[in-house]
């Protein structure tokens, strides 16, 4: 590499020390935030490569600047691998984030002010699915659908009825905190019944879809978006897929020159590396283990009457737990667990009664611990440590026991092998 670690440390000790502290934190913490993962050294090498120097507005073979022959090869590799993974005819690998991907998808499908249906944030949706504080809620007339108040599952009869009443131009499916299988074919049936387009945001489950462990939305959605991190285990970024050539042209124009300038070709290269990793048979084993570990943790909570798992369990990489019988709110739980080096996030639950800054629940994800090598036994242990912490929040001796147990686990499963 052009600039090695010793040069970096000597040139900017303050920044070096901050990065070193973050590396230490990640090594010594159990990471359960469902949107986080652990990338390979190859992904980091690509993202830190000399490609960061190159400006390349446009698309392969159609650039505004010269000297782009090499980055054309890089971006084409990423595109072709993404298409192969998801069985899509067209892929745009340039979005800087999942939110950018969603923005471009909306621009390709609807006009400002159009009516759109998206999943309610408290029910498991995402900010970009119509939250009032998001560009999506401010640009389009979003109306939220929720889950059944009893089962906490998607109620397709209710969604159909709502769609027939409000006649949306677009229905958005996908979630950031829904632990069950999503039937995308039913969403397409509803969209067709009311003359709407269907967009799916599969950011959280993309790795499971890639491994064939969750039904794919690509055959049903007019446009599918995703992040490239989370369960895909790639760099932070976005990806857009479609099987419609005309929509592909609109997507490309929406990304550039619509909402972005030059693509981050070093990140595109990192996406290409991670896509190659996804195509390796070992990735399917990883994804299967993610689900096993998620279920193993959920089962521990299901056996404790002081906790309630939203929708009764999990079929993917995450689940939500109502913690209000044990601690005041999700924020309190998050902070308590931070103190014992277990990292997760507070999370609203369906029909939430507390503010989003407090919440009734926490969200637990298995992607990152699985990437480190945790199995079902270790995952059950993690769940037990969470319960032990929350039930003994004022007992420093018990909390110290938890910290020691966390250290044993993180030492046994290093973030990266030397």
Swiss-Prot record:
Molecular functions per Gene Ontology: glycine hydroxymethyltransferase activity; pyridoxal phosphate binding
GO biological process: glycine biosynthetic process from serine; tetrahydrofolate interconversion; tetrahydrofolate metabolic process
Cited InterPro entries: PyrdxlP-dep_Trfase, PyrdxlP-dep_Trfase_major, PyrdxlP-dep_Trfase_small, Ser_HO-MeTrfase, Ser_HO-MeTrfase-like, Ser_HO-MeTrfase_PLP_BS, SHMT-like_dom
Task performed by this protein: Catalyzes the reversible interconversion of serine and glycine with tetrahydrofolate (THF) serving as the one-carbon carrier. This reaction serves as the major source of one-carbon groups required for the biosynthesis of purines, thymidylate, methionine, and other important biomolecules. Also exhibits THF-independent aldolase activity toward beta-hydroxyamino acids, producing glycine and aldehydes, via a retro-aldol mechanism.
Cofactor(s) needed: pyridoxal 5'-phosphate
NCBIfam families linked: PRK00011.1
Catalytic activity: (6R)-5,10-methylene-5,6,7,8-tetrahydrofolate + glycine + H2O = (6S)-5,6,7,8-tetrahydrofolate + L-serine
Protein location: Cytoplasm
Enzyme Commission identifier(s): 2.1.2.1
UniProt binding sites for (6S)-5,6,7,8-tetrahydrofolate: 121, 125-127, 246, 355-357
Similarity comment: Belongs to the SHMT family.
Matching PROSITE patterns: SHMT
CDD domains membership: SHMT
UniProt site positions, description: Plays an important role in substrate specificity: 229
Pathway in which the depicted protein is active: One-carbon metabolism; tetrahydrofolate interconversion; Amino-acid biosynthesis; glycine biosynthesis; glycine from L-serine: step 1/1
Organism: Streptococcus pneumoniae (strain ATCC BAA-255 / R6)
Gene Ontology cellular-component terms listed: cytoplasm; cytosol
Keyword Transcription regulation: no
Modified positions (N6-(pyridoxal phosphate)lysine) in chain numbering: 230
Keywords: Amino-acid biosynthesis, Cytoplasm, One-carbon metabolism, Pyridoxal phosphate, Transferase
Gene designation: glyA
EC main group: transferase
Record text on subunit structure and interactions: Homodimer.
Protein known as: Serine hydroxymethyltransferase
